[in-house]
Amino acid sequence: MNRINQLFDSNPRDLLSIYFCAGYPTLEGTTEVIRTLEKHGVNMIEIGIPFSDPMADGMVIQNAATQALRNGMSLRLLFEQLHDIRRDVKIPLILMGYLNPIMQFGFDNFCRQCAECGIDGVIIPDLPFKDYQEHFRTIAERYDVKVIMLITPETSEERVREIDEHTDGFIYMVSSAATTGAQQDFDGQKRAYFKKIEKMNLRNPRMVGFGISNEATFRAACENASGAIIGSRFVTLLHEEKNPEKAITRLKAILNLSSNDLR
């Protein structure tokens, strides 16, 4: 069974997934970040593939991607770095990146490399669901790579149900239609969106991302889904500390989490 399915199989709550950009802050630090996050009890990790035009991301992640590219990170190098990661890392790993570099690499080759490295899923924010269905789904399923689709408050109920029916892993609930970045709390409109999706009784578990930056937003996400995805706040801490151990320790303090709260 795919590790994403294994994670959600027992209907867990309060899951923490962390996003970081491969090759940032240092080119060779990718596997160190992964191992450090797992050691601290993080349940799932999203590894960002740096791209020059990350349209769904705010300035924090854009700047990290720019620096990672300057450092020399590429998709080919990332797969080389991840080749032996499954010798000791057990939690689900997901690659998150834009369609352009993945298509240049070749989608079949990309999925094959994911399978060989033990990557469990992929998030491609600019992949239309129709294109996924017609051109990508068969290839991804051949390699047991879960393609995680995003929904926003603007996504129609019909499309949400289509995504729920034709994907298998989890649904990424974007907290707003804006780019990634910190929010102090979720307003009534966002909370109504969470409740609307909850009432749809979807078969797939849900994770909330975009804007999770403190204990209030983390708890609100966990109340309305299986857990939260944190990106910009962790990348900011990684920028400040230049050390994944210190960065995740600070993040857990901000979220008021101990290692016992995770897993």
Curated annotation (Swiss-Prot):
<dbReference type="InterPro" id="IPR018204">
    <property type="entry name" value="Trp_synthase_alpha_AS"/>
</dbReference>
<dbReference type="InterPro" id="IPR013785">
    <property type="entry name" value="Aldolase_TIM"/>
</dbReference>
<keyword id="KW-0822">Tryptophan biosynthesis</keyword>
<comment type="similarity">
    <text>Belongs to the TrpA family.</text>
</comment>
<keyword id="KW-0057">Aromatic amino acid biosynthesis</keyword>
<feature type="active site" description="Proton acceptor">
    <location>
        <position position="46"/>
    </location>
</feature>
<feature type="active site" description="Proton acceptor">
    <location>
        <position position="57"/>
    </location>
</feature>
<comment type="subunit">
    <text>Tetramer of two alpha and two beta chains.</text>
</comment>
<dbReference type="GO" id="GO:0004834">
    <property type="term" value="F:tryptophan synthase activity"/>
</dbReference>
<comment type="function">
    <text>The alpha subunit is responsible for the aldol cleavage of indoleglycerol phosphate to indole and glyceraldehyde 3-phosphate.</text>
</comment>
<dbReference type="GO" id="GO:0005829">
    <property type="term" value="C:cytosol"/>
</dbReference>
<dbReference type="Pfam" id="PF00290">
    <property type="entry name" value="Trp_syntA"/>
</dbReference>
<comment type="pathway">
    <text>Amino-acid biosynthesis; L-tryptophan biosynthesis; L-tryptophan from chorismate: step 5/5.</text>
</comment>
<protein>
    <recommendedName>
        <fullName>Tryptophan synthase alpha chain</fullName>
        <ecNumber>4.2.1.20</ecNumber>
    </recommendedName>
</protein>
<keyword id="KW-0456">Lyase</keyword>
<keyword id="KW-0028">Amino-acid biosynthesis</keyword>
<dbReference type="InterPro" id="IPR002028">
    <property type="entry name" value="Trp_synthase_suA"/>
</dbReference>
<dbReference type="InterPro" id="IPR011060">
    <property type="entry name" value="RibuloseP-bd_barrel"/>
</dbReference>
